[in-house]
């Protein structure tokens, strides 16, 4: 299933163009999800390149991580591509539900989503120490409760 961010969207095309640009060498994406959205936009631009580059994509939901690994099984062995299960912040850094916009139309879903994030964070390790210190390009798309702290 194609992701919300894909090559048919302006953001997806911008990600593809940035990934195709050999001026940038190191990429980090937080929020792989199923690997078929922004991850695909990045890899569509990166995989044809014949220069040195590295791509790290993190997912904290084990189920979606497994979907991404299955989708990208043909490139999983590429040492430039690092699809990782983990997180870079801790549970206590997730934003409190009450600090999100009151008018958000999906607010009623927040308690469920927050609990899912907490459950996932208890299952996966903080792997920030395994990542390079600097990246040329970073996309933060981890979620409602984590993205500000990840920034």
PLM-predicted stretches and their roles:
Residues 1-151:
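A short alpha-helical cap/connector motif
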């Amino acid at each position: 299933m194609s992701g919300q961010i894909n090559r048919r969207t302006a953001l997806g095309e911008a990600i593809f163009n940035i990934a195709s640009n050999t001026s940038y060498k190191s990429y980090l994406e937080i929020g792989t999800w199923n690997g078929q959205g922004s991850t695909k936009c990045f890899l569509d631009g990166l995989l044809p390149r014949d220069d040195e580059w590295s791509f790290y994509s993190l997912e904290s939901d084990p189920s979606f991580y497994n979907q991404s690994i299955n989708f990208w099984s043909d490139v999983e062995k590429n040492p430039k591509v690092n699809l990782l299960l983990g997180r870079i912040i801790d549970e206590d850094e997730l934003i409190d539900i009450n600090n999100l916009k009151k008018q958000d139309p999906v607010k009623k879903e927040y308690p469920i989503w927050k609990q899912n994030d907490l459950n996932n964070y208890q299952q996966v390790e903080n792997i920030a120490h395994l990542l390079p210190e600097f990246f040329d390009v970073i996309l933060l798309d981890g979620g409602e409760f984590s993205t500000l702290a990840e920034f």
